[in-house]
């Protein structure tokens, strides 16, 4: 796996990872969006299967994580611009996205905001805060989540 520091036009640095830098032709690039508080290193236990399937893992540390500099005012939607910047720097036109835990929302943002570039999306163990509008943080979200899930998913255990 190759690690690179990409300098963006706004002066920030994104620390990126690429398992296919030496053999990119014909391989599907899959952008890995990490959960919190992890860094962006793609899931090494999946490398062998990815190699057999012709998958190239690409990722980056979200702003403020690992080797990436912070992005003031960052929101989930800004992940699309960052992923596009990494793809452009690596010469990747179209790619799939995969997110784990809180990275799931970042993967979904990429799929929604980059529809001409993202060919597929996978979310593994994604989460969504079900706290009431206007609340701060996730304190007490479990109390809110249970009845909300019960209404949205009748018949499921909560």
Report the location of each language-model feature.
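A domain-start/cap signature at the N-terminus of enzymes
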Residues: 1-6
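Conserved HGGG/HGGXW glycine-rich cap/lid loop of the alpha/beta-hydrolase fold
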Residues: 12-67
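Gly/Ala-rich beta-loop-alpha elbow adjacent to hydrolase catalytic centers
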Residues: 99-103, 107
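Active-site signature of alpha/beta-hydrolase-fold catalytic machinery across serine-
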Residues: 109-113
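Alpha/beta-hydrolase-fold enzymes
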Residues: 119-158
